Design a protein with these regions (language model features):
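Bacterial N-terminal signal peptides that target proteins for export
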Residues: 1-7
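Bacterial N-terminal signal peptides
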Residues: 7-18
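Extended, histidine- and acidic-residue-enriched regions that form the cofactor-binding/catalytic faces
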Residues: 21-111, 115-131, 139-291
Length: 291
């Protein structure tokens, strides 16, 4: 079984690299390009660059710490094989304070997260990435990244930041068997069975509980940072033991297709940067803005 998983993983990695390079003659991966090839790649991608955003955190007792990074890069690399874009190297400097009690979690300060992401997108922009798609592979970033995108209006930029998060809603999706599936559960385990089957230890998935402990009783409209720990102290939500390869393959195919379509749409978008420039110009003289 382990040998079969290793073979599947190696075949998947080989297919990504060969498909991407056959379609364009260039690797989509920033770190694999030479300096001269990087210039060609930026032109080939029409200035569209992707920042797949993962995290390092516990994923139940059965999935690797880098699950979010592994899966988001798998989807991004396959999408870039279908619609060429330059992919930034591994990035996992996001919000994961709620898992600091678990082994292996790497949690950076709020200021570090925002400063590093700003410096990274600035450097991407300086290198010709005028349309930067941050592909979010981690649920803990769902508030961080829209805020970051909104904060780009504070200072003029010659690039646009787009945030993409695939939510898995599509016709014909195989039925799930779990009532709760929020972290390291059925769907995420299924996705990793496709991206890195050799790192999935499904036989261990039932060693810890992924049930909602419901230890906090507050009004529905109240938010507090300890909510996740109150519900899922094992940092596990759902049941990875019921995951199937069928679900993983179906989801990943839909994910890759939707992301490839998104890359095409952003390549065609000429309005966002135009309006952003207009906004920056008007913001210099707000009293002159027509009322």
């Amino acid at each position: 079984m382990k040998m079969r998983c290793l073979v599947l993983s190696l075949l998947a990695a080989t297919s990504i690299a060969s498909f991407a390079q056959t379609a364009t003659g260039l690797s989509p991966k920033w770190e694999e390009l030479t300096g001269p090839d990087f210039i060609t790649a930026i032109h080939q991608s029409q200035g569209v660059c992707i920042l797949p955003f993962g995290i390092i955190e516990k994923h139940g007792p059965h999935l690797p710490l880098g699950t979010d990074l592994i899966n988001v890069r798998y989807a991004t690399e396959h999408a870039a094989a279908a619609e060429y874009a330059v992919i930034f190297p591994a990035y996992y400097f996001g919000q994961i304070a709620e898992a600091k009690h678990e082994p292996g979690t790497v949690s950076y300060s709020m200021h570090m997260q925002l400063d590093l992401l700003q410096e990274t997108t600035d450097e991407m922009g300086r290198n010709g990435c005028k349309k930067i798609i941050i592909v979010n592979g981690h649920g803990g970033n769902e508030d961080l990244l829209p805020y970051f995108a909104q904060s780009q209006l504070q200072t003029p930029h010659d690039y646009v930041v787009y945030i993409y998060r695939w939510h898995g809603n599509y016709p014909g999706r195989p039925a799930e068997h779990s009532k709760i599936d929020m972290h390291a559960g059925e769907s995420e385990t299924a996705h990793t069975m496709v991206a890195r089957p050799d790192l999935v230890h499904q036989d261990r998935a039932a060693q810890e509980s992924g049930a909602d402990q419901a230890r906090l009783h507050l009004p529905q409209d109240v938010y507090t940072g300890i909510w996740w720990y109150a519900r899922f102290p094992n940092h596990y939500s759902g049941d990875g033991s019921v995951a199937t390869l069928e679900l993983g393959q179906s989801d990943m195919k839909a994910y890759v297709g939707d992301l490839a379509d998104t890359i095409r749409a952003i390549k065609a978008d000429q309005t966002s940067l135009q309006l952003q420039n207009e906004f920056f110009e008007e913001s210099k003289h707000p009293l002159d803005t027509k009322q």
